[in-house]
Amino acid sequence: MNKILNYIVVFFLFALVSCDYKPILNYKNYQFSLNVDKISGDEKINSIIINKFNNLKGNEKQYFINLSSKKEKNIISKDSKGDPVIFELIINVDYNVKKNGEKIIENNINRKTTYNNISDKFELENYENTVINNLSTNISDRIIFSISELNEW
């Protein structure tokens, strides 16, 4: 019985190591460049998104993008004193992509999350910055993915 268990464990370890898992968005070699034409809205969100686009420079197929971002922070719930307990953060990005002067994609992406208030305001601000960074990175990945789907045709 012990020998069979050892063989099963070795088999599963071998199977796990030989899978060669790679995240799709991190290792894919995109065959296009993405250049920013116009940006407006929240500077922090735009800079995070544009930094992801900078990895796509130098390819022969070139697309041009216009971005407009907006951040909204709402109070969802208050305690009996009127202090906020739960916040909602909404990031909205409108974008359009052009190739050879022709608009080929026009889209809107919304991402939102809720989180609890933190009594330490410095810690709350750091947490909000982390949330903004994560949501903006997710939005930039969605934009890149939508263009890569178009590029495969």
Question: Could you tell me what each predicted segment is?
Answer:
Residues A15-S18:
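C-terminal motif of bacterial Sec signal peptides marking the signal peptidase cleavage site
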Residues K3-V10:
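Sec-dependent signal peptide recognition
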Residues D20-K22:
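Bacterial signal peptide processing site
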